[in-house]
Design a protein with these regions (language model features):
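Transmembrane alpha-helical interface segments in multi-pass membrane proteins
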Residues: 303-305, 312-357
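Peri-transmembrane interface segments
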Residues: 16-27, 241-244, 248-295, 305-307
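A structural signal for hydrophobic secondary-structure junctions
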Residues: 82-223
């Protein structure tokens, strides 16, 4: 066995050590590493969970990529211009590499009115191909109706925000009013369900109806819609797939003379994704601070251990041990201390994350954070990398302090107590 490793194990595992300073120093160093690692694991898991939860909510309302009329996309949705989305164009979009799903949609602005109040909303017409998974997971009352593109069933979904403002309930009848060049038109709808995503930007205005109704209210032809929403197979490949769509679809013209264009969800919601991007910077700051805390406590602990083991160092030097061997002994001991800290830190960090995941113990204000509880997400690769980086960095920064050993004079140190 390596002499340095053997000596380090004997010192580290010595339960009969009565030294008054080094043992507390070891405990403090271990605690510093453990707390630092636990905070790093919790920070990464919470930020990943938060980013992906908010991202999935935004994508749930607008998918990954939208293909529509150039004028509509340029106006950022404030004005609606139709574009032809017939079977031919749908097939073109479906066969672009990296596309997972394609669905049509049409917007129409209107008013929901009760006997006591009214509310301006944006009706989003969807067809039978609509992927309702996101809204289904957000339903709090009622059911999702079958949305058709060939006939109107006068059924809608509203958000909890709308329901609270207008005092609406599932299966209730409500009148909606639409204003166009021909005047005011009224429609009577049945509220089939109520959803809640806590994404205020959409919950305040988004109301779902069938594609046929939205298209007819806009006065468009049978193959005209606001556009198509495209889901990609891999979100990380979004820029690549977007470029393929640009090359295939953008600047082409439909048979009505309207020009096609496309936008990614990041271009449609730049503020939200910029805000989510800032969280990465926060994580790096936290990681740096926690590594600094762990490193400083380890340096302090190592110097205290060396100071109290000065007599032993002198004896080893007198017996012919080289400075390198003695330095490696204390570095190995530091590795054992760091290892114990990592074990404790993993137990604390992962334990708290599991507790939050299954109990939702820590609550948040959904009006501010868009989620009602702190979201967490495990990423074992990141957790392993954090452990490895902590071990390597903490060990590396101890190399310089360990050179204090070379300054110790064996003749004087053997008399040191």
């Amino acid at each position: 066995m390596n002499l340095s490793l053997f000596l380090a194990r004997k010192i580290f595992l010595d339960k009969g050590d009565k030294r008054k300073v080094s043992r507390p120093a070891i405990h403090i160093a271990t605690a510093g590493v453990a707390i630092g690692l636990a905070v790093m694991i919790i920070s990464v898991c919470v930020v990943l969970g938060f980013k992906h939860t908010i991202r999935d909510k935004v994508i749930g309302f607008g998918s990954h990529i939208q293909v529509g009329n150039f004028l509509s996309l340029q106006s950022q949705g404030t004005e609606q211009y139709p574009v032809a989305m017939n079977d031919s164009m749908m097939n073109v979009l479906k066969h672009i590499s990296g596309i997972k799903h394609v669905q049509r949609f049409a917007y129409k602005q209107g008013l929901l009115k009760t006997n006591n109040d009214f509310l301006g909303v944006n009706f989003k017409g969807v067809g039978p191909e609509w992927d309702s998974t996101f809204i289904a997971n957000s339903m709090i009352e009622g059911t999702i109706p079958h949305f058709d593109d060939k006939a109107s069933h006068n059924k809608i979904l509203v958000s909890k925000t709308m329901a609270d403002k207008l005092n609406l309930k599932s299966n209730q009848k409500i009148f909606a009013y639409f204003i166009d060049n021909n005047g005011v038109r009224a429609r009577r709808f049945t509220i089939c369900g109520i959803y809640e995503t806590n994404l205020k930007k959409y919950d305040q205005i988004m109301c779902f109806c069938d594609l046929y109704t939205a298209r007819k209210l806009n006065g468009w032809e049978e193959d005209q819609v606001s556009g198509a929403e495209l889901q990609v197979e891999n979100f990380e490949q979004l820029p690549i797939v977007a470029n393929r769509i640009i090359g295939k679809v953008n600047k082409t013209v439909d048979h009505y003379g309207e020009t096609y264009s496309s936008s990614t969800i990041k271009e449609i919601n730049p503020q939200i994704f910029a805000w989510l991007g800032l969280m990465d910077l926060n994580v790096w700051v936290i990681l740096g601070l926690m590594l600094a805390v762990a490193g400083i406590t380890m340096i302090s602990g190592l110097l205290i251990i060396i100071l109290e083991r000065t007599n032993m160092i002198g004896i080893l030097k007198a017996l012919g041990a080289r400075n390198k061997t003695i330095r490696h002994t204390f570095l190995w001991m530091s590795v054992f201390i760091i290892g114990r800290g990592l074990l404790i830190g993993n137990i604390i960090g992962l334990g708290l994350i599991v507790l939050q995941q299954y109990t939702s113990l820590i609550k948040l204000d959904p009006q501010t954070y868009y989620v009602s509880t702190v979201p967490v997400e495990f990423n074992w690769l990141y957790i392993v990398l954090i452990n490895i980086a902590t071990m390597l960095i903490c060990t590396f920064i101890l190399i310089a302090p360990s050179y204090v050993i070379s300054k110790i004079n064996p003749a004087k140190s053997m008399h040191y107590e």
